[in-house]
A protein has these predicted regions:
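Alpha-helical bundle segments that constitute or directly flank the non-heme di-iron/ferroxidase center
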Residues: 1-25, 47, 51-58
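Short, contiguous alpha-helical
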Residues: 7, 31-78, 115-153
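Acidic/histidine-rich alpha-helical segments that form the ligand environment
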Residues: 8, 74-117
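Amphipathic, well-ordered alpha-helical segments in soluble domains
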Residues: 12-19, 48-51, 102-105, 109, ...
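A general structural signal marking secondary-structure boundaries and capping sites
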Residues: 20-23, 63, 103, 110-117, ...
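Short, charged helix-helix connector/hinge segments
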Residues: 26-30
Length: 153
């Protein structure tokens, strides 16, 4: 079975790790749009990766036929708004560490999914986003843009 998400996830996880390694504490506290900070955005990434990790763990425990349901797109904004205060409350360096560690854990779990689980997920309309890379890329690009060209890479 073709699993293009594995290499893409690995690539964006490496970008995430490299970004976190070079961010100073001052960088992590830098404000972004809508009241977020760089550290809070990293915590946000950890939150959504942890969601996928939890869904996979429950799915594997409950059996192949218990495919998780998709999240309603209109719920994403209020979930993000609700989680923002928690993301901002984390110590900035802890948020960065959590983002990398959770990305490591979810990518290992996604890569280890059985072919039956991957096929069942696809048949259900991909309620579990195996391409963790897409969300990471969006926010890594956002952070690099905020840092400016001299600090981005």
């Amino acid at each position: 079975m073709d699993r293009p998400y594995v290499s893409r996830n690995n690539h964006e996880r490496a970008r995430l790790r490299a970004l976190v390694d070079r961010l100073s504490d001052r960088d992590l506290s830098r404000p972004l749009e809508a009241g977020w900070t760089i550290a809070a955005v990293l915590a946000h990434l950890a939150f959504w990766d942890q969601r996928i990790l939890t869904l996979i763990e429950r799915w594997e425990k409950d059996g192949l036929r218990s495919v998780p349901r998709s999240i309603d797109g209109k719920d994403v904004d209020w979930i993000n708004d609700s989680a923002k205060a928690l993301c901002l409350a984390l110590a900035p360096r802890e948020a960065a560490r959590l983002a990398v560690n959770t990305a490591d854990a979810v990518d290992r779990r996604v890569e280890a999914l059985s072919e039956q689980h991957v096929a069942a997920n696809a048949a259900a309309g991909n309620p579990i986003s195996l391409f963790r890379s897409e969300h990471r890329r969006e926010h890594i690009d956002e952070i690099e843009h905020a840092l400016g060209p001299s600090r981005a890479r």
